[in-house]
């Protein structure tokens, strides 16, 4: 890959790698809680504390593919920097959701709701980027240049 192409995706790759570390942390918490109450073997059922950790991890894993798709789509089709920033915010609220779920379930609600909004924002960024691509393809009009012109005046 050339340097310019790398520069266009490096922030997205960093956010993706941070999300992998976060997933490993969540998995470690599940394993630790399982071994604490079930001995050496991993069981999917157990104490209420284990059930909360396992469910919180599973909920995060369920949303993870969607997050990766909209993160990379928004970064590639629209703009890398806002997509990477939104991705970092999503990881922050996902951490808040996970930790909140381990306490009372009502503590996890703000993280869950804000996480859904960030996913929606990334999705809309992706749609805007794809729409701009087709504007260029069919009409030769780059909407992104109009936005840059308006914002610099």
Swiss-Prot record:
Cytoplasmic side: 31-52, 103-107
Residue stretches spanning the membrane: 9-30, 53-77, 81-102, 116-128
A single Gene Ontology CC term: nuclear envelope
GO biological process: leukotriene biosynthetic process
UniProt keyword Kinase present: no
GO function term, MF aspect, one: glutathione transferase activity
Keyword annotations: Endoplasmic reticulum, Leukotriene biosynthesis, Membrane, Nucleus, Transmembrane, Transmembrane helix
Top-rank lineage group of the source organism: Eukaryota
Record keyword Transmembrane present: yes
Residue ranges that the UniProt entry lists as topological domain Lumenal: 1-8, 78-80, 129-153
Location of this chain's protein in the cell: Nucleus membrane; Endoplasmic reticulum membrane
A Pfam family this chain is assigned to: MAPEG
UniProt record similarity statement: Belongs to the MAPEG family.
Quaternary state and interactors: Homotrimer. Interacts with LTC4S and ALOX5.
Record note on domains: The C-terminal part after residue 140 is mostly disordered.
Protein name (Swiss-Prot/TrEMBL): Arachidonate 5-lipoxygenase-activating protein
Organism: Sus scrofa
Higher taxonomy: Eukaryota, Metazoa, Chordata, Craniata, Vertebrata
């Amino acid at each position: 890959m050339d340097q310019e192409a790398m520069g266009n995706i490096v922030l997205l790759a960093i956010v993706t790698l941070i999300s992998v570390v976060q997933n490993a942390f969540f998995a470690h918490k599940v394993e630790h809680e399982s071994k604490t109450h079930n001995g050496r073997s991993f069981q999917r059922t157990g104490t209420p504390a284990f059930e909360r950790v396992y469910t919180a991890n599973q909920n995060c894993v369920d949303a993870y593919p969607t997050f990766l798709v909209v993160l990379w789509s928004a970064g590639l089709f629209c703009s890398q920097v806002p997509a990477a920033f939104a991705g970092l915010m999503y990881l922050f609220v996902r951490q808040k959701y996970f930790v909140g779920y381990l306490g009372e379930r009502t503590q996890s609600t703000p993280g869950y709701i804000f996480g859904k909004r960030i996913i929606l924002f990334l999705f809309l960024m992706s749609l805007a980027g794809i729409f701009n691509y087709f504007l260029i393809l069919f009409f030769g009009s780059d909407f992104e240049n109009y936005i840059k012109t308006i914002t610099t005046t």
